[in-house]
UniProtKB/Swiss-Prot annotation:
Gene3D superfamilies: NAD(P)-binding Rossmann-like Domain. The lineage of its organism: Eukaryota, Metazoa, Chordata, Craniata, Vertebrata. This is Dihydropteridine reductase. Changing residue 7 to V: No significant effect on catalytic efficiency for NADH. It comes from Rattus norvegicus. The gene is Qdpr. NADP(+) binds at residues 11-35. Its EC number is 1.5.1.34. Keywords: NADP, Oxidoreductase, Phosphoprotein, Tetrahydrobiopterin biosynthesis. The active site is at residue 147. Pfam families: adh_short.
Length: 241
């Protein structure tokens, strides 16, 4: 149950990742009720749902759906932020192709699909669902086949959720954010020579999510929002087809 004064309620799928942890911290600091969904607990969250690792999508989806249902009961949430994901490279000839594709599908497609179903059950009317896309996946990604496939599927899912009879609550919005590179400790460690001024600060996305949750400058449902940082300045631009 949300304590008195906790203005809003949010689920963060991937709540122990770099961006997810920042979301949990920022929204708890605003006295919101925030639940983390991840493979490990986030002790800073109001509650945590621990995802059991499995090679069966249906097993994992059923487990998470059941545990979120127990946690929330009849309570609705203002937002579900799916910020789970990861990166793996490799072209179609790579020995690691199958393994990396499997990983990318689990980290991006499974989490996004489960989040979407949770939205149909637990999101308020007029609420917000965000999904984690990628600007690179607007085009071909020959050097990272699995990643591009997974993110492309997330983009398609987002647009489907905005359509009539998608199952989403009335007035709710599904929006995908399409960054280039996020400024995370892991990315800095793996790419120490990179131009960090072209990386998007996590705080920018956290504040963007806050705006959209509170109805400020929220894009239309189905929008694929490119997140591009140049010389330390970040801009949001819709992708059009």
């Amino acid at each position: 149950m949300a304590a008195s004064g906790e203005a809003r309620r949010v689920l963060v799928y991937g709540g122990r990742g770099a961006l997810g942890s920042r979301c949990v911290q920022a929204f708890r600091a605003r006295n919101w009720w925030v639940a983390s969904i991840d493979v490990v607990e986030n002790e800073e969250a109001s509650a945590s749902v621990i995802v059991k690792m499995t090679d069966s999508f249906t097993e994992q989806a059923d487990q998470v759906t059941a545990e979120v249902g127990k946690l929330l009961g009849d309570q609705k949430v203002d937002a579900i932020l799916c910020v789970a994901g990861g990166w793996a490279g490799g072209n179609a000839k790579s020995k690691s192709l199958f393994k990396n594709c499997d990983l990318m599908w689990k980290q991006s497609i499974w989490t996004s699909t489960i989040s979407s179903h949770l939205a149909t059950k637990h999101l308020k009317e007029g609420g917000l669902l965000t999904l984690a896309g990628a600007k690179a996946a607007l085009d071909g990604t020959p050097g990272m086949i699995g990643y591009g496939m997974a993110k492309g599927a997330v983009h398609q899912l987002c647009q489907s959720l905005a359509g009539k009879n998608s199952g989403m609550p009335s007035g709710a919005a599904a929006i995908a954010v399409l960054p280039v590179t996020l400024d995370t400790p892991m990315n800095r460690k793996s790419m120490p020579e990179a131009d960090f001024s072209s990386w998007t600060p996590l705080e920018f996305l956290v504040e963007t999510f806050h705006d959209w949750i509170t109805g400020n400058k929220r894009p239309n449902s189905g929008s694929l929002i490119q997140v591009v940082t140049t010389d330390g300045k970040t801009e949001l631009t819709p992708a059009y087809f």
